[in-house]
Amino acid sequence: VLRGITLGPVATQDIIGTVDLGEFDADAGRLVTAQLVDAGDNVIETTQFVLDSTGAFTVPTKAPNGAYRLRLKASHWISNAPVVNLTGSGDSVGTQVLTNGDVDGDNSITIFDYIDLSGSFDLSTGDAGFNAEADLDGDGSVTIFDYIILSNNFDLSGL
């Protein structure tokens, strides 16, 4: 009891949704970072989860009810930050498609990503110098198809 106020356990509520890792063959097993941010872009909570074969996720939060953004980021995808209005009843952000091509992980798709991808061009898993982050389609090799993905999303930045 503090000045007549009794502090009790903070209720946990869930944010649910689905992540689709754009242009990638195997979403299952990929790590996603989720940040709950307020209107001032202050990070309230951070958690990580591993995608299953459906991409479905549940993020528990102790944040009070209100409007937030749930910033979702995976390794070589730029972040997306849908609005979520916490009401205490399993609030959903629906399906969020993350944009592929951020080879260097800086949340923007730029010439530096082309440079990193070029360093692994024509290499496959197990080859010396292979950068798994440059394998944008997840087929185990860095090919022209990875360049196409990067080119289609060039000059985009995450939220």
Show which residues each predicted segment covers.
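Cellulosome-associated attachment modules in secreted, modular CAZymes
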Residues: 8-159
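Surface beta-loop-beta hairpin patches that serve as ligand-binding interfaces in beta-rich domains
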Residues: 1-9
